[in-house]
Amino acid sequence: LMDVDQPELSIVFGRTKRRVDELTRGLKLRGFRAEGIHGDLDQNKRLRVIRDFKNDQIDILVATDVAARGLDISGVTHVYNYDIPQDPESYVHRIGRTGRAGQSGQSITFVAPNEMGYLGIIENLTKKRMKGLKPPTAQEAFQAKKKVALKKIERDFADEAIRSNFDKFKGDAVKLAQEFTP
């Protein structure tokens, strides 16, 4: 989903400290710049992670509700509720982290079949109906990642220092193209 959405700055909420650690580890393994915060972290580590998030050193903050209380971070484009919150007010608090200061934002909540009734309670509280989404296909995720890679190459080649050394990169580019051609 993140491969396709390409969020600029996002917060992923997990219900427990263990879930936050699992999600952070998984996102890092997939190449995302992610860090987690929860109640077991010492204050210095929490402050460092929040500072890094605000300063674009990390793109994804994974957090429990308690650890995220009081955070005021602008520019969050996506909120992912990996675990549905335990109370409807927490949901409102979570989604309020995106789309601030007149900016648009998106909130995505993962819901298990046995949680659908609870989702209805949240919809009644927020007075908004949530629409179901189909997960992106592997092909859609691949195409999105390819698009990002091509944009990075274009951006890099806009740099005169790189462009002037194109001949040095040409052989590597041809080799990569041959190596990864299906």
Role assignments for model-derived ranges:
Residues 1-182:
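Conserved helicase RecA-like core
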